[in-house]
Curated annotation (Swiss-Prot):
It holds the Pfam family GTP-bdg_M. Monomer. Associates with the 50S ribosomal subunit. PANTHER family: GTP-BINDING PROTEIN 6-RELATED, GTP-BINDING PROTEIN HFLX. Residues 198-361 form the Hflx-type G domain. The keyword Nucleotide-binding applies. It comes from Spirochaeta thermophila (strain ATCC 49972 / DSM 6192 / RI 19.B1). Its main location: cytoplasm. The keyword GTP-binding applies. This is GTPase HflX.
């Protein structure tokens, strides 16, 4: 949250009572609304066995929220659940203040952090698709003011139709621009595939320290802040892994619990970098009290985007913040504790990357006398050279044959 010198507006958070604090996403929602500049003054949670059509929650629970909002003079009510357009309108009429659901909060944060043309297009697409079914509530006050005779179209209805056409037209232009960017990215990825260079993608929950680890591995500084969703664009760099050779490392957008499907769809091109990886570094915030929830959410998102089968190393980051270290859950993947901030464990991580690459993409050797050096080009033109040495008798090379795509 930014300090503007003015008192931040206050809000109420409303969510589902889970019975287990570690599975509740309300604390995370509190951090998200703070990122938008609001102060969560009250958090209300209710059991939700059967969703109600009008308010999602029951009428008695709705009255509790409305009474709390009136008593405290609240400017915003935020729901940790997705609301239908009708439910959102009903709540706004009841509490007489702005109402947002979790999806809208996340889309708004994405919009504020989008820096590149692609990220701006992706977030605008998600925002417009979210807004489209909610146009009715935006102009209904015009029809109420004018009354409107039966069988005639009111001013509000005409405005809705005009807005709908404008949004659909804008969405069509956005899709065309995104397709042009994606074609260029596909060409770039194809060239890397042809070069046979292995690709390593950093994935994990938002604010786990992926960008800090990316900087530590590649030596290339990227935008790093202790805030959610600072990274929305995929940043890719080639780096040299001792004992292996060149790899392409990618820093990707962070995951979050209940990641809106509109954003998964809008960012599908960005997430292609994850699906095309040969090895994933699953970065986990070791100091987070919600570590287990972050692990399960990451697994869900990787499954949703079709990347759960890719070889993976679980990297518990921020080891410098966690003492003593918590008891870690069992894992099917190799794991290591590191601190991207201090460098602790990074050498061990590099060794683990080499071990996993060799396990999945075996190393071969080539020995050629000097009079046959011309034959090396055919073998090594698409290989990953790990070690090359000219000896007294000829050329000695350790290499990985052209690393196949994970989809091959």
């Amino acid at each position: 949250m930014y300090d503007t010198g003015q008192e931040a507006p206050r809000c109420i958070l409303v969510g589902r009572k889970t019975g287990r604090e570690e599975t509740s996403s309300l604390p995370e929602l509190s951090l998200l609304v703070e990122e938008l500049g609001y102060i969560p003054e009250t958090i209300l949670s209710f059991p939700l066995r059967t969703p109600e059509r009008k308010f999602l929650f029951g009428p008695g629970q709705a009255e509790v929220v409305a009474r709390e909002a009136r008593m405290r003079g609240i400017e915003l009510v935020v729901f940790d659940e997705d609301l239908t357009p009708a439910q959102q309108r009903n709540w706004e009429h009841l509490v007489k203040s702005r109402v947002m659901d979790r999806t809208e909060v996340i889309i708004e944060i994405f919009s504020r952090h989008a820096r590149t043309k692609q990220a701006q297009l992706q977030t605008e697409k998600a925002r417009l698709e979210y807004l489209l079914p909610r146009l009715r509530g935006a102009w209904s006050h015009l029809d109420r003011q004018r009354g409107g005779a039966r069988g005639t179209r009111g001013e509000g209805e005409r405005q809705i139709e005009l807005d709908r056409r404008m949004i659909l037209s804008r969405l069509a232009r956005i899709r065309r621009e995104m397709e042009a960017i994606e074609r260029h990215q596909t060409t770039t990825r194809s060239r890397r595939l042809e070069a046979g260079i292995p690709r390593v993608s950093l994935v994990g929950y938002t604010n786990a320290g992926k960008s800090s680890l990316f900087t530590r591995l590649t030596g290339q500084a990227v935008r790093i802040q202790d805030r959610p969703f600072v990274t929305l664009d995929t940043t890719t760099r080639t780096c040299l892994i001792p004992g292996w050779g060149r790899v392409v490392v990618s820093d990707t957008v962070g995951f979050i619990q209940h990641l809106p499907h509109t954003l998964v769809d809008a960012f599908h091109a960005t997430l292609e970098e994850v699906r095309d990886a040969h090895l994933l570094l699953e970065v986990v915030d070791l100091s987070s009290p919600n570590l287990l929830l972050h692990l399960s959410t990451t697994e869900e998102v990787l499954t949703e985007i079709g990347a759960h089968h890719i070889p993976r190393i679980r990297v518990y980051n921020k080891a410098d913040r966690s003492s003593p270290h918590p008891l870690l859950p069992p894992s099917d993947h190799p794991e290591i504790l590191v601190s991207a901030k201090t460098g602790e464990g990074i050498e061990g991580l590099l060794s683990l990357i080499v071990r996993e690459m060799e396990r999945h993409y075996p190393i071969e050797t080539l020995e050629l006398p000097y009079h046959r050096l011309g034959e090396s080009h055919e073998v090594l033109s698409r290989a990953v050279i790990i070690h090359q040495e000219y000896t007294d008798v000829g050329l000695f090379v350790r290499y990985a044959p052209s690393v196949p795509s994970v989809h091959e």
